[in-house]
Amino acid sequence: MNTLYLGSNSPRRMEILTQLGYQVVKLPANIDETVRQNEDPARYVQRMAEEKNRTALTLFCETNGTMPDFPLITADTCVVSAGIILGKPHSQAEAIEFLNRLSGKQHTVLTAVCIHYRGNAENRVQTNRVVFKPLSSEEISAYVQSGEPMDKAGAYAVQGIGSIFIQSIEGSFSGIMGLPVYETVSMLQDLGYRTPPFIRA
């Protein structure tokens, strides 16, 4: 089997891995995602991915009495605008605030990936730069009313309606979605796990 454990509830991360041909088993990895005072954004996403991995791994071991037979992947994504971390908005008002902040400017999207396999772990942070067109208040209001921004870092989905706001991307589309494919597969290979199933099809 080409099985992976995914410590995430993100349908986007699940979609990315299943498209590569992996059988994905979801594990809960609920943690406190509060940003520490003056915490560096790259360190923040790395810490989140690592804490999710530890949480999911501990729960798996407690439930099954053994370590996972397959790699456990966790990830975290944040949007950074002018040095300020924009996570998932907690309200429509906050989503509007985030989108006004991103309007007409460049921002950074950081995604950290942590993989644990057979007692070894790999961690990487992948960086992307995105430029938004200037947004009108009507566009922002209509987008927020669609509901799409409410469970997305930075209050937009690169693969959804939010794509109409994007002028340019420098980096990885899948990384902005929440799981950079190139880095993730490279980490799996470095840990000695099999290449994506489609390669041997």
Curated annotation (Swiss-Prot):
Alphabetically ordered keywords of this record: Cytoplasm, Hydrolase, Nucleotide metabolism
Pfam families per UniProt: Maf
GO cellular component: cytoplasm
Enzyme Commission number: 3.6.1.9
Cofactor(s), names only, from the UniProt record: a divalent metal cation
Organism: Neisseria meningitidis serogroup A / serotype 4A (strain DSM 15465 / Z2491)
CDD domains the record matches: Maf
Compartment(s): Cytoplasm
Gene3D superfamilies for the chain: 3.90.950.10
Broad class of enzyme this protein falls into: hydrolase
Function: Nucleoside triphosphate pyrophosphatase that hydrolyzes dTTP and UTP. May have a dual role in cell division arrest and in preventing the incorporation of modified nucleotides into cellular nucleic acids.
GO biological process, one term: nucleotide metabolic process
Annotated active site: D76 (proton acceptor)
Family named by the database record: Belongs to the Maf family. YhdE subfamily.
GO molecular function list: dTTP diphosphatase activity; UTP diphosphatase activity
Catalytic reaction(s) noted: dTTP + H2O = dTMP + diphosphate + H(+); UTP + H2O = UMP + diphosphate + H(+)
Protein name listed in UniProt: dTTP/UTP pyrophosphatase
Domain of life: Bacteria
Residues with site note (Important for substrate specificity): R12, T77, Q159
Keyword check for Nucleotidyltransferase: no
